[in-house]
Amino acid sequence: ATIADNVGDNVGDVAGMGADLYESYCGSILATAALGAAAFIHSADTVMQFKAVIAPMLIAAVGILLSIIGIFSVRTKENATVKDLLGSLAFGTNLSSVLIVAATFLILWLLQLDNWIWISCAVVVGLLVGIVIGRSTEYYTSQSYRPTQKLSESGKTGPATVIISGIGLGMLSTAIPVIAVVVGIIASFLLASGFDFSNVGMGLYGIGIAAVGMLSTLGITLATDAYGPIADNAGGNAEMAGLGAEV
């Protein structure tokens, strides 16, 4: 049973999650590259088309390298509390995000892409939307905040109350992410199009580049998410070996 539990953790929480996020990662890059080529198709400027195609690839590639820097910046002590551990992980993610913002402005400046400053701002919008979604998820799922505490208290009156409260809380928890995504789409469209609704090509390119920005920190976030199953596997191995409670 312990082995099956460990295998299930690896399949669902590492392989499954990794494949899902990898698909989103590659999909955003390829879609943005196609939108970049289409955005400049009427100008017959093949050089600018090429720059628009490789820009999301360069941002994603640099994001991987900067995520590695963020991972190595995570430092903890042996007797660290849960709050200290979460703070250290948050520091690594935030550091990667800041470095990616700086790298994005540098990359698009070197490419001299049309409207490169506002396109860079669209990447920042994507990163901010990702942060908002992450914070919202933490707020609605962490035991440190009121929603889960209130849900736990509802269990005192019976399982039916927990089910009803849980479904309601789950529905409510989608509001902030949905609003953040809608605002991000509108903002990135306006920024990349130069606040011109008729410039649909550049607006759609801005939405795509914002999605690339949102996923540019995937390296460190995926590593953080995979830590849970790995730690659980270690606990399972210790249990099978009959090791003491201190392990």
Describe the function of each predicted region.
Residues 1-247:
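Hydrophobic packing and interface segments
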